[in-house]
Amino acid sequence: MSAESGVPTYRGRGGIWHEYKWENYACQTAFIRNPAHVIDFHELRRIEALKCEPHVGHKIITALQTKYSNTSIVTQNIDGMHQRAGSQEVIELHGSLWRMRCDKEGKLFENLSQGKYANRKCSCGEFLRPDIIWFEDQLNESTVVNATHVISQCDLFISIGTSGVVWPAAGFQQLAKKGGAHCIEINPEKTELSYLFDDVHREPAGQVLSRLFDSLL
């Protein structure tokens, strides 16, 4: 979804993990070893994300959520583009670049408008950790429960720009289908799960969402 806005991807062709080793930047071990180094890396991701703007697809989703309150957004992206487009309720499976947390005191700090971190340490003296699901981390259980609940209850499920191979997201289409949902895939590239969808679109998300929903907004 965000690649269409120009946000660098992590796993895709030419993605960030082709240039950097996640073992040095995106795991708790790396953070313990060199927190400033890890924070520098994520600060750069924030700065790069702020150079990009939400595209028409993000704005259509926000408009749908505003008009139809039962519209749910579940994302694996950590760049905050949905919120910057105006969406209020976003289930973030992998956390957010824009939140920092103090694991010692359980505090959360969020800022969607500033690339550089306002503070790198909590008032207690501990380094603040990006509130992101890193490699080797466990997903937040309540977030997963929330996501699976709304997906199991939906009547229309749209997968946008994801390979669908990372769990639990890999099982979301089948969960939605089991509940009777019509399932649509929007992805320029064929995925391993494409054959499971009722409709498949190989065009940019903004273009497809405009065609599907402009008449409803």
Model regions: which residues?
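Conserved catalytic core of sirtuin-type NAD+-dependent deacylases
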Residues: 1-217
